């Protein structure tokens, strides 16, 4: 999918204020930079991180990610998963990297179930490192990929679903301008109990309002540049 997007540019300069001796070399192509995190393409080497994340019971309960579920159960954590993801025209998967000395990715963010004709997609943001929680990384990653969705994919609406007990994720969505649009009663199951799933949505003009408010842009615009931050 990303290979077909000829107007995506790589940003090769290393993040500022990060000592070279503690910074992991970049992998993949940087798609978007914010003030706290940057988003890069999903590479085969990232399968090692996915292997670690899919066995985290806390992430499973808080996210219930179909992306991680498919990697573990449909592909048996195999290398073919990467090729399947990259050739899937209905999703864009990006890895979340944080500045200031982090030695591994802090999560993954994606737009999925992309409907180009109708102009809408679904958002999933997973912050996987407990040390990265409550630092605004998930909030900014969600903003950056939303801007990407508007600028590159041309979407006009983005939806997200969150378990009702994941208050932090709901607050993160609201900070990004999402509006609660409904509740799917007892649509989620955590292995023991059924839970409500809360539906959020945001429109293109609302995404643009957030961008103007926060002054965080895609490199394409300005060279300077279930959703989750678990509690």
Region roles according to the model:
Residues 1-47, 52-55, 100-231:
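Acyl-donor (CoA/ACP) binding surface of acyl/acetyltransferases
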Residues 47, 58-59, 90-91:
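Generic structural signal for secondary-structure transition and capping sites
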Residues 54, 63, 85-86:
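Hydrophobic residues in alpha-helical segments
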Residues 58-81:
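Conserved GNAT-fold acetyl-CoA-binding loop/helix
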Residues 60-63, 93-94, 210:
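Short, hydrophobic secondary-structure boundary micro-motifs
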Residues 66-67, 94, 189, 216:
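Sparse recognition of residues in long alpha-helices and their boundaries
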Residues 69, 81-95:
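A short helix-loop-beta-strand connector motif used in the catalytic cores of GNAT acetyltransferases and
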Residues 79-80, 96-97, 146:
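Short, well-ordered amphipathic alpha-helices
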């Amino acid at each position: 999918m990303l290979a077909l997007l000829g107007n995506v540019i790589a940003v090769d300069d290393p993040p500022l204020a990060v000592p070279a001796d503690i910074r992991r070399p970049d992998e993949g192509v940087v798609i978007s930079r914010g003030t706290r995190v940057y988003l890069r393409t999903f590479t085969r080497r990232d399968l090692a991180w996915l292997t670690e994340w899919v066995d985290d019971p806390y992430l499973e309960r808080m996210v219930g990610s179909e992306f991680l579920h498919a990697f573990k159960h449909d592909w048996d954590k195999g290398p073919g998963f990467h090729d399947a993801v990259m050739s899937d025209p209905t999703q864009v998967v990006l890895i979340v990297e944080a500045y200031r000395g982090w030695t591994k990715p802090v999560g993954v963010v994606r737009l999925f179930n992309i409907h180009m004709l109708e102009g809408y997609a679904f958002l999933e943001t997973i912050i996987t490192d407990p040390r990265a929680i409550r630092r605004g990384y998930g909030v900014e990653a969600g903003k950056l990929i939303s801007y990407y969705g508007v600028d590159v994919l041309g979407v006009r609406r983005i939806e997200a679903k969150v378990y009702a007990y994941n208050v932090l994720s709901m607050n993160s969505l609201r900070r990004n301008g999402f509006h609660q649009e409904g509740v799917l009663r007892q649509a989620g199951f955590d292995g023991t109990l059924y839970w409500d799933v809360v539906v959020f949505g945001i429109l293109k003009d609302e995404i643009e309002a957030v961008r103007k408010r926060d002054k965080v842009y895609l490199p394409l615009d300005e060279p300077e540049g279930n959703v989750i931050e678990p509690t």
